[in-house]
């Protein structure tokens, strides 16, 4: 029966006005902190009154310029930039290991790790290098034997140390970026209206002196990313050129401007002794008069640039404004919960406050009170002072 009785109960709020300087100051201080948080952080900093578009649409076109010297040759853009289409990801080659006049055939491996004494050491379980292992151990020189391969011969020797193209430090990168926020049908580009042809020809990007110049010097990009050019050019690496578009569309159109930042994207592989840096291979193919094909194999080390575009835009909208305002006013009530905890557990006279705040009323209690004191309400008023709030009692302190 007790379970049934407990189930069929009803709870209602009893309002108690506590006139205490301590709890009053705490209550107002908490309310002030909550209001300050919503006004300062939520509304002003996070702009919760705006609807935001994070689905930025972007296109990037790049162009590299500069000349360098490498292996007694003058290198231009067609020699050291790949791919040539001017995409958002491109590589500037700074060092190459060249293996010329390779033809299809049989030849010994040239690396020390393929050294052998007998054919049994050149089985298919051995990891191949420059081609398919034939299973034979052949003479590489008069003093060394290595496993034979079938493929492009002679095989590559990539353990030699080659110089780097130092002129690449002064190459320039031109970036043309266009963005669009589809929710607001807002379009803009990094070539700002105040840039002239004269400015484009002579300006170089600098985060303070020329933050909107679209032409970047390679050496500056490497420096802004916290890297050493000579070391990076020798081993290769991947750098990120980040263009951020964070726009408040409640402001003027010309205040939506790009912000450039730079970082190394392969920082983890840089510390690896297994495969540090960045390199790749490609070949140039030729044919002799008799129709035989041969090629020049190039192992290229270079700096890969990834142009990364990100951003979001915000604009005033009544719906998020109402939602944020309601959340702010509702959160003010959190102060009441905190003050109740302090009032009922930590302040002097906590038991007295608990007795006033929580009261259990049953039908038996009401009948007994009514029979012994017909003017119960008026008598109670002599003990407790009725406040101006409806249904509230004031407890002095």
UniProtKB/Swiss-Prot annotation:
A matching Pfam family: P2X_receptor
Phenotypic effect of disruption: Mice deficient in P2rx3 lose the rapidly desensitizing ATP-induced currents in dorsal root ganglion neurons. P2rx3 deficiency also causes a reduction in the sustained ATP-induced currents in nodose ganglion neurons. P2rx3-null mice have reduced pain-related behavior in response to injection of ATP and formalin. Significantly, P2rx3-null mice exhibit a marked urinary bladder hyporeflexia, characterized by decreased voiding frequency and increased bladder capacity, but normal bladder pressure.
Membrane spanning residue stretches: 21-43, 323-341
Residues reported in the UniProt entry to bind Ca(2+): 158
Keyword set includes Amino-acid biosynthesis: no
Reaction catalysis annotation: Ca(2+)(in) = Ca(2+)(out); Na(+)(in) = Na(+)(out)
Glycosylation sites: 139, 170, 194, 290
Keywords on record: ATP-binding, Calcium, Cell membrane, Disulfide bond, Glycoprotein, Ion channel, Ion transport, Ligand-gated ion channel, Magnesium, Membrane, Metal-binding, Nucleotide-binding, Receptor, Transmembrane, Transmembrane helix, Transport
Record's protein name: P2X purinoceptor 3
